[in-house]
Amino acid sequence: MLSSGQSESLNQPMRMVICCLLLSTGLLAAVPSPAEQNALPATERQVEEVVTRLTGIMTTTQQAQSDAARPDVRMTTCSVQLEGDKSKAIYLYQEQTMSNNLGAPYRQRLLRIAASADGRAVESAGFKFVEAKPLAGLCAKPAAERLIAPMALDGDPTCTVRLVQAGDKYMGTTPEGGCQSNVRGAARITNEITLYKEGMDTRDRGFDAQGNQVWGAKEEPYRFRRLTP
């Protein structure tokens, strides 16, 4: 019979052999190394980065304080789940309000953030809601309760912005000629976006059927700056 000390001394090598066998056969969970994590497709990383930069609360308060002609707008964006969707796209609910009237959003939409078909950019596709008012304040709810039913969406995307990484920022525009619209007297809308870590600049503009600008940024873009992560 082996003593307890002899048994322990034999068990130690045995443990090492068993551990090595488990590792070699894949029975122990493998943790991706930093190098493996960084090996993700560039567009996948970019989609996640665009989502991170869009999510949270941004305002134009600083701009409005320096120029009384500028509106003080709050933009709130949060992740949501589109029921039944199995794609790799990430969905965001976004609403805009005047900072002095937070309970009455004047713009609400769903954004679908995904890699472009050619894998060279990130696309942000915007959807209108059939009934938007009941969704006001959605971002204040727990993530598990932020569910959007497909039937809540009013058809296909109203517009898509293609975002391309340029250094430490993302830049994008609407398609040439803009997108059809019926928002506040505009027959079409255009937008130019620069997305930073600390916020974004946007030249969101609406034009009537004769090509006259009826609302939106003119000489200077709206400068949204992050209020919360």
From Swiss-Prot:
Keywords: Lyase
Keyword hit for Lyase: yes
Tagged with keyword Nuclease: no
Domain of life of the source: Bacteria
GO molecular function: lyase activity
EC number(s) on file: 4.-.-.-
Entry-linked InterPro entries: CpcT/CpeT, CpcT/CpeT_sf
Record-stated family: Belongs to the CpcT/CpeT biliprotein lyase family.
Function: Covalently attaches a chromophore to Cys residue(s) of phycobiliproteins.
Protein name: Chromophore lyase CpcT/CpeT 1
